[in-house]
Amino acid sequence: MDAVLEADTRAVIGEGPLWDEENGRLYWVDILGSELHIFDPEEKINRSIKFKSFVTALAKYSKDELIMTMKDGFYLYHLRDDSLEKIKQPKDMHESLRFNDAKCDPYGRLWAGTTSMEGEQKQASLYRLNLDGSLVKIKDQVSTSNGLDWDRERNLMYYIDTPTQEIVRYSYDPQSGDVSNPEPVYRFDQSDGLPDGMTIDQNGMLWVALFGGSRVVHIDPFQKKEINSISVPAKYVTCCAFGGRDLKTLYITTATEQMTEKERYEQPHAGGLFSAQLETGGYQPVPFAGDV
């Protein structure tokens, strides 16, 4: 299966696609470009909003408000009047770190992890912003906190710390939000590229973007094997998320950051937003359900 181009944006690091059912559009970000993108699939129009700091991931809060992780913390963005409010910053947030991927769990808690901007290993963390506004560190000694998602039927959480080359499965308590019993369920070969963003479909199967691998791979975490893949005409595939009216469109983001001049010539649409139509759909993204 091949992905098709939706928006030719040449993002530095496209990331964080988030489907907004209420407004019928897709939000996504360019981390190093410090931009929020808004894509209208009906009109095939993509517009962007520039910020003064990195924008790394998104969660819906209300019809006209988003929770955004930016370089140093959590922010509330008002789409209607283009205003930004800081909500929370980890006490141990060092200036050499930045936030990376984030997503709300089935109960509306927002999980977000960090990464070192200097390539240091095991300096980052995974946090959870609770419904009461408290911020809890879930895991330290992380290198590049990346893809995460939840199996709603089986009360499981899947998580990727990119340099480990692994997808790790946890038991997940939906009432408390706590996770336990980590178990690696799939390991990528170095030749596959680096596992980056991830989403789950309604069968409990995983879709993982491979940075440097030009693919999104379909993984069965129970049989611990690759089922299928989507070819993307861009080397650095960063993230994927379900959207569209039937939630069967997989939106895929890509990057240009590490590309050579030769690669840029051969992959002119790298950094763009792509999509693939799938038979099995995903879940509606859960908005942040806490108070800000």
UniProtKB/Swiss-Prot annotation:
The leader peptide range reads none
Supply the InterPro entries for this chain: 6-blade_b-propeller_TolB-like, SGL, SMP-30
Does the record's keyword annotation contain Transmembrane? Answer: no
Q: GO molecular function, one example?
A: gluconolactonase activity
Q: Which UniProt keywords apply?
A: Cytoplasm, Hydrolase, Metal-binding
Describe cofactor binding as the record notes it. Answer: Binds 1 divalent metal cation per subunit.
Biological process according to GO: L-ascorbic acid biosynthetic process
Binding site residues for a divalent metal cation: E15, N146, D196
Question: What are its E.C. numbers?
Answer: 3.1.1.-
Q: Where in the cell is it found?
A: Cytoplasm
Q: Which Pfam families match?
A: SGL (PF08450)
Does the keyword section mention Cytoplasm? yes
The cofactor named in the record is: a divalent metal cation
Alphabetical GO CC annotations of the entry are: cytoplasm
Q: Which family does it belong to?
A: Belongs to the SMP-30/CGR1 family.
Protein's recorded name: Putative sugar lactone lactonase YvrE
Q: Which organism is it from?
A: Bacillus subtilis (strain 168)
